[in-house]
Amino acid sequence: MMAPPSQVQGRLSSSMNKSLALLTVTLLLGGCQSLIHKTPDGTPPVEDTAVETKAKPEKYGSFSEDSLYSLLVAELAGQRNRFDIALSNYVVQAQKTRDPGVSERAFRIAEYLGADQEALDTSLLWARSAPDNLDAQRAAAIQLARAGRYEESMVYMEKVLNGQGDTHFDFLALSAAETDPDTRAGLLQSFDHLLKKYPNNGQLLFGKALLLQQDGRPDEALTLLEDNSASRHEVAPLLLRSRLLQSMKRSDEALPLLKAGIKEHPDDKRVRLAYARLLVEQNRLDDAKAEFAGLVQQFPDDDDLRFSLALVCLEAQAWDEARIYLEELVERDSHVDAAHFNLGRLAEEQKDTARALDEYAQVGPGNDFLPAQLRQTDVLLKAGRVDEAAQRLDKARSEQPDYAIQLYLIEAEALSNNDQQEKAWQAIQEGLKQYPEDLNLLYTRSMLAEKRNDLAQMEKDLRFVIAREPDNAMALNALGYTLADRTTRYGEARELILKAHKLNPDDPAILDSMGWINYRQGKLADAERYLRQALQRYPDHEVAAHLGEVLWAQGRQGDARAIWREYLDKQPDSDVLRRTIKRLTGAETP
């Protein structure tokens, strides 16, 4: 155990003081490797402030014995993984000594630990105590940008620019993505100010283009990049130009741009990946498959690429190839759950029920667990194995209690979708015994109650949800629509739907409800307007049934029949459409 400062002071001679000072300086210079670069899990942390230019070595000043002792304790604490003590001591000493080396060390520790405020404070101390150190100025600029202090960040970034260092104007611009328009406008002015001094600086031009993109001005951003001959062939501006073209519905121009970029940068993964993804977006699946296969061949250790290739193969219905890549992922112990889930999907496509169930059963907790449980349940129910489905879900709830509520929801939904309404009701009731006030379970029970014509229970559950979450647009809309459709309480229905619409004005389901309440109240023109908006956003057979009914009520039977015919061709098993057509025309078909 280390002696307290008073005892240490009593034992130190002047020569020992010098030795201790040398030891501490050695620790300060070398400790960064032991504390920062050798992380607890053995992996080096990402260093945001890394640069190509070599900084001048910091000169350490003379420290008091108390400071030396505090710094030694910090280093020993770091070696024992007590990073909280190491950070605290270094921050205090950085503030006390104003020494560039101590400030840098404090900053590196804070950055590694994700201590944002300490990283900001110590980066500023470092930058002020080492005005000629470009690393320090860049660190301060980045931390200020992270803190939303963009104008101050620009000041420090300009110092880096003046020193011909590697700037991060792109990071500064990206960090402002979620800011308000006034802040972006001010930042754009700062960029323009610097561009007057450095009109051909590619980093500045790229940063400004990013800001213009975020400001909803893609045409100006694209023009800026295309007019900048100095950086138009660099990878980052090239990728931004591609994204801008796609956002402007000019993907046909983006493809040749990226293809030319591949020729210019054949070893750059980002360009080839952007090209492959754009091929997928344009539904050129065979070309995309070939491009992803080339990427996997070029970067054989990149399992993210291998997984993307497998998904493209699935989309292209290249089943055998998809299986090969998915099984490779399992063998490589990478994307294992996602691989099993997609192997299950593949088996379903090939009508191999046993293989599908086996693959879904191997998906562990994580992003693919619930989708796998849902598919497994659906497969069993379609095969008539209702009891087995219930047993598997019960076992899953027992083994993974954190997923219990979602598993009750899956069980009820799957049973309801497979015309097992009574069993769905029993499942949701069992869930509510365990979790009586869970809003998702209550909402689901309300939907099942409506199918059972138990409107009182439906309204009770939805009122409970709304009381707990007054701005729950889904619950407001569900209750409002049901009151409009199943009762004559149109005033209440309208109030609920209007509130939902105010909360979520572009939601197709809410727009459908707006159309329906207007129809119920005889406002046919408004009804048609809302229903057409809903159908444009979500081409759905139920919305088409509603729109056709409104057109029929307007005396536009031909238009109504055309809508019904179009959507009946798309979904011939739609009960809603067929009931509407039968009720209004007396015929089975329009």
Curated annotation (Swiss-Prot):
It comes from the Bacteria. It holds the Pfam family TPR_19. TPR repeats lie at residues 235-268, 269-302, 370-403, 405-438, 508-541. InterPro entries: CellSynth/LPSAsmb/PSIAsmb (IPR051012), TPR-like_helical_dom_sf (IPR011990), TPR_rpt (IPR019734). Keywords: Repeat, TPR repeat. SMART domains: TPR. PROSITE patterns: TPR, TPR_REGION. Disulfide bonds: none annotated. PANTHER family: LIPOPOLYSACCHARIDE ASSEMBLY PROTEIN B, TPR REPEAT-CONTAINING PROTEIN PA4667. This is TPR repeat-containing protein PA4667.
